[in-house]
Amino acid sequence: DEPEYAEAIREYQLKYGKI
């Protein structure tokens, strides 16, 4: 079970590559 912000983090990684 992922937190709701996990989806935003995935989009961030798609845009920027890594955190």
From Swiss-Prot:
Its cofactor is Ca(2+); Mg(2+). The modification 4-hydroxyproline is found at residue 3. The keyword Cell membrane does not apply. The modification 4-carboxyglutamate is found at residues 4, 7, 11. Belongs to the conotoxin B superfamily. It is found in: Secreted. The keyword Calcium applies. Expressed by the venom duct. Conantokins inhibit N-methyl-D-aspartate (NMDA) receptors. This toxin has the highest potency for the NR2B/GRIN2B subunit and a smaller potency for the NR2D/GRIN2D subunits. It induces sleep in 10-day-old mice when injected intracranially, and hyperactivity in 24-day-old mice. Adopts alpha-helical conformations in the presence of divalent cations and is unstructured in the absence of divalent cations. It comes from Conus parius. One of its GO terms (molecular function) is ion channel regulator activity. The mature peptide does not contain cysteine residue. Keywords: Calcium, Gamma-carboxyglutamic acid, Hydroxylation, Ion channel impairing toxin, Ionotropic glutamate receptor inhibitor, Magnesium, Metal-binding, Neurotoxin, Postsynaptic neurotoxin, Secreted, Toxin. This is Conantokin-Pr2. One of its GO terms (cellular component) is host cell postsynaptic membrane. A divalent metal cation binds at residues 7, 11. It comes from the Eukaryota.
